[in-house]
């Protein structure tokens, strides 16, 4: 990482917060034709939050003042009891921060709704004008910012009913996420000297597309059901972090930045059926998988350049169970396996391929007077972790 100098800082923060919000909504629907409607909705939302952080700087105290104390949860009084002066005398007004955040949001949506016997479809657009104010006193600088933006998001929802027990649904929506006011402030927060945060006034809004498919069916005669779904989402100009290091102090600076390349996908299939006409013997299987890709920017050490960091997660899972059911007894055996693979292109030490296993059974006796007696036994195992203590049974 470099040849660092010794840097010592003792700081104590008190940060009371207060927040509230309220909303008012109205909806109107106008028939256009048979089973076709145009729906308008409006909602006003107001939100308020306040933070009043006091930072006390104990860096002037002799080295080792708190060396005899062992860290413990909520043990602040142990540290404050060693101060040589009243706590108020250590208050640093520059490092303390007071802020107020107000948002005024208008949600306006128009939706075309078509309702038929076999299918239903909703197509619409949502507009969201938003006005925000942010006031802050920090580092001797007074900030009073105002921002007005208009977010928009199209929506699509289609449902098809094959019969009373089988249906298909396809859904699409998109959202625009604006960076927060604090992320846009061009201010460096070094309250924690080793973990510095920095704003970025050049942030762009993030735009996310989401697609979902869902299908389920049920056959009463065989007590047979099937369900499957698939999700996919991708984000343009996602707001991630850029992490850099100071070669002199070893301090880490985190700044929000726009990154591209974030997407994820999930899918699953469930099948349940009885294997005899009486429904006494049953089997169930649930298969699932997901893939996630996240991007950020990282400086691996003080002398290297900032590089794009890609982290990928792959998860596969399977659960299988079988059961025997009568009017007074239910016996079930089940087992599951989950595989997770994570890969980081810059930090190979974080790459992992892990397995989790679970298997066992349960037994339930039905007794008179609506009473029951149950017991179960399961074994859980984990494998593939770098720390041997985590590879447990």
List where the protein language model places each region.
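Primarily recognizes Gram-negative and organellar outer-membrane beta-barrels
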Residues: 1-393
């Amino acid at each position: 990482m470099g040849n660092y100098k010794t840097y010592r800082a003792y700081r104590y923060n008190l940060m009371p917060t207060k927040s509230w919000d309220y909303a008012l909504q109205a909806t109107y629907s106008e028939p256009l034709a048979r089973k076709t409607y145009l729906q308008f909705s409006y909602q006003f939302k107001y939100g308020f939050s306040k933070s009043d952080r006091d930072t006390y700087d104990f860096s002037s105290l002799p080295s080792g003042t708190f060396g005899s104390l062992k860290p413990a949860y909520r043990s602040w009084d142990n540290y404050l009891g060693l101060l040589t002066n009243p706590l108020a005398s250590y208050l640093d007004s520059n490092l303390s921060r007071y802020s107020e955040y107000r948002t005024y949001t208008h949600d306006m949506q128009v939706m075309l709704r078509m309702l038929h016997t076999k299918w239903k479809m909703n197509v619409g657009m949502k507009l969201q004008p938003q006005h925000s104010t942010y006031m802050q006193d920090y580092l001797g600088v007074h900030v009073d910012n105002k921002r007005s933006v208009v977010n928009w998001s199209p929506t699509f929802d289609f449902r098809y009913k094959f019969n009373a027990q089988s249906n298909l649904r396809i859904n699409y929506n998109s959202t625009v996420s604006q960076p927060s006011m604090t992320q846009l402030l061009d201010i460096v927060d070094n309250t924690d000297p080793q973990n510095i945060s920095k704003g970025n006034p050049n942030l762009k809004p993030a735009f996310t597309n989401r697609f979902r498919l869902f299908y389920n069916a049920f056959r009463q005669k065989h007590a047979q059901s099937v369900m499957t779904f698939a999700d996919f989402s991708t984000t343009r100009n996602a707001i991630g972090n850029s992490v850099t290091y100071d070669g002199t102090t070893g301090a880490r600076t985190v700044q929000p930045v726009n990154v591209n390349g974030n997407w994820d996908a999930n899918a699953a299939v469930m099948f349940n059926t009885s294997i005899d006409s009486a429904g006494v013997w049953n089997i169930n299987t649930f298969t699932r998988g997901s893939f996630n890709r996240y991007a950020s920017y990282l400086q691996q050490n003080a002398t290297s350049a900032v590089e794009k960091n890609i982290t990928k997660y792959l998860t596969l899972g399977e659960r299988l169970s079988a059961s025997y059911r009568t009017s007074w007894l239910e016996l079930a055996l089940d087992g599951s396996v989950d595989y997770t693979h994570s890969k980081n292109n810059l930090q190979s030490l974080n790459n992992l391929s892990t397995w989790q296993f679970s298997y066992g059974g349960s037994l339930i006796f039905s007794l008179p007077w609506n009473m029951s007696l149950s017991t179960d036994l399961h074994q859980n195992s984990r494998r593939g972790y770098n720390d041997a203590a985590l590879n447990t049974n």
